[in-house]
């Protein structure tokens, strides 16, 4: 649950009976200009209709903080129609009004019954964005939705948990985000070519 008018979130841990037995408070950060170091990469993603940007890193290293500033750059500097798919209220904060760090980007929360991939599909079907931003891609349905949306010419900007590109490629669910990996056997003649 997002904390209204902030970037912070509170999550409950529950026991097997459904009773709350712990709370986690995540402090969201807005650091204006943090994406300036990758401005050329953001500019390239903004300039091509099939370009996408995937931020990979372990939990807690600042992927979402960077994602917020990339979103602002795409919306305000490059004047793109940016839709932030944010069902967990982690990117743009809690409440009905997105945090000011989003700039002119729009946000979709979805309904409590919708999954993230359903909100992704609704965003492209009903709102015509040039760019869709989403945090923490983690399952096959979300990966399939992202690949489908990207094939329609919408730029995708997303984060995913991982420690390296190599490890991401070894993950059969997430590897399609970076083109995938397939095993091949090549004979001596073909290898010499």
Question: Each PLM stretch: what is its role?
Answer:
Residues 127-190:
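Conserved P-loop NTPase nucleotide-binding/switch module
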Residues 66-69, 115-122, 145:
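Well-ordered alpha-helical segments embedded in enzymatic catalytic cores
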Residues 74-123, 169-170:
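P-loop NTPase switch/communication element
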Residues 23, 27-37, 97, 106-110, ...:
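Long, charge-dense
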Residues 46-48, 74-77, 99-103, 122-127, ...:
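Conserved catalytic network of the ASCE P-loop NTPase/AAA+ motor domain
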């Amino acid at each position: 649950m997002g904390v209204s008018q902030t970037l912070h979130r509170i999550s409950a841990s529950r026991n097997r009976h459904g009773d709350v037995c712990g709370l986690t408070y995540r402090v969201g950060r807005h650091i204006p200009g943090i994406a300036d170091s990758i401005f050329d990469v953001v500019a390239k993603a903004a300039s091509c209709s099939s370009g996408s940007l995937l931020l990979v890193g372990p939990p807690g290293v600042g992927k979402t903080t960077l994602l917020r500033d990339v979103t602002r750059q795409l919306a305000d500097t490059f004047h793109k129609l940016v839709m932030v798919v944010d069902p967990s209220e982690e990117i743009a904060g809690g409440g009905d009004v997105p945090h000011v760090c989003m700039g002119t980007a729009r946000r979709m929360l979805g309904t409590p019954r919708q999954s993230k991939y359903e909100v992704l599909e609704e965003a492209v079907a009903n709102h015509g964005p040039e760019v869709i931003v989403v945090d923490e891609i983690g399952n096959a349905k979300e990966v399939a939705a992202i690949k489908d949306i990207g094939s329609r010419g919408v730029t995708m900007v997303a984060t995913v948990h991982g420690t390296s590109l190599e490890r991401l490629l070894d993950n059969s669910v997430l590897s399609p985000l970076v083109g995938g990996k397939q095993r091949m056997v090549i004979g001596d003649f073909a290898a010499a070519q």
